[in-house]
Amino acid sequence: MLVVIRGAGDIATGIALRLYRAGIRLVLTDLPQPTSIRRTVCFSEAIRLGETVVEGVHARRADTAAEAAALTEQGIIAVLADPAAGCVQKLHPDALVDAILAKKNLGTHITDAPIVIAVGPGFTAGVDCHAAVEPCAGIHSDGCCIRVRRCRIRAFPV
């Protein structure tokens, strides 16, 4: 099974680690200049450094979709500088996870893969994706899978 994850920041990396440990081949996409803050726990660092290791799991930068596919065949997580996730058209993944956390949909469509899961606000399950996940830390619905409504944007006092 091949899964493409849009985003390679800390939340996307956590998702990737879980899927990788379940034996799933992974390609992550991010910006050419990643904006991750917690860089030591982000696979996005592979774009800057060529490769990185998080919790003992290796990820390596790929420059093309074909190179990414070859890396996944070797059991290595591939990370592409591909913010629009154009690689999806070439890789034909079994599932797509949007974990960009941009608070709005930046181009993920329910037709991008047989299974499309979106993490964070800005997505409507059944319209943009098959299921949406509410990621707000500390909220009782954290990690809740939503299949029929929109994820909410919450404002927290500073």
Locate each region found by the language model.
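Well-ordered secondary-structure scaffolds
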Residues: M1-V158
